[in-house]
Amino acid sequence: VLGSKKVLVSSQDLVTTPSLKIKKKASKNRGLTRVKEGTLNGRQTFGTFVKGASNTLAAIAAERVGENPGKSYNPLFIYGRTGLGKTHLLNAVGNTVYDNNKDYKIRSFSAEHFTNKVISSIRSGKTKELRDSLRFDCDILMVDDIQFISGKEGTQQEFFHTFNALYDANKQIIITSDKPPHQLAGIQERLVGRFEWGFAVEVLPPDVEHRVAILQTKARSLGLSIDEEVLFVIAEKSGGSIRELEGFFNNVVGQASMLGNPINKTLVLDVSSRLLSTKSVDHRTIELIQKETAAFYGTTVQD
């Protein structure tokens, strides 16, 4: 992948501390930034986005859109499984544009929110106001999880005409989805075609080295020094998504902090065992409910 770079953690630089002391570094990032519509997460910037083979192409495309919105890669369509950083890139573009020109009218929301806006405007008789705000008072439209409008014909109709108006005016459109355009079921063919007009790019689950790089960035932000071997164990024991990785890491750090223990292999394995045990209990509980429900109705779980 263009610009991919394998990042490893040097054990010479990282030493396991006997006791955990989290030193939160002063962040230069703002919190939530209110834009024309919606908010931007100030912590999700290109500076905090860790590139790897799985996401470099998407990151480069997003960076270029952030520097020159409406000039290239329009629309920018980022797709991939949940928890891989699509929303982070969406916010990073918005933050870059906002920092460069605060006069830009940025509208950022989920596809579910867009659907609710359409329904609300119909009920209140303010459809024209909605259309005018989206089509003529917007420089950048960012919509997260577009797959949500699947099967919603009225919402798709509004989005189709909004897309056309913004595209014709050279306004930037950025969309995220869990699938590539051609695999979106229940979406009008004419919309799918427009999603493919620009640049569609996938983000994939990070490999082990990439996950370690993400963990190192996380650890540094907390002022922690963690041995390379321990980081690899965390990377291997966590799930495939960045969200799962960060969740597992937070559990490790949290347990170490509460018990006053160092972050080492033993602690990581203990956390892994605890989390797997919880999942196992949840799974057994679901099975029990299914069996009892089936017995009550005189049927089987398979039925």
Stretch-by-stretch model annotation:
Residues 70-91:
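Walker A/P-loop nucleotide-binding motif
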Residues 102-138, 146, 150-153:
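Short glycine-rich substrate-engagement loop in P-loop NTPases that contacts/grips substrate
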Residues 119-123, 181-197:
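Short regulatory helix/loop adjacent to the ATP-binding pocket of P-loop NTPases
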Residues 185, 198-210:
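Conserved AAA+ ATPase "SRH/arginine-finger" region at the nucleotide-binding site
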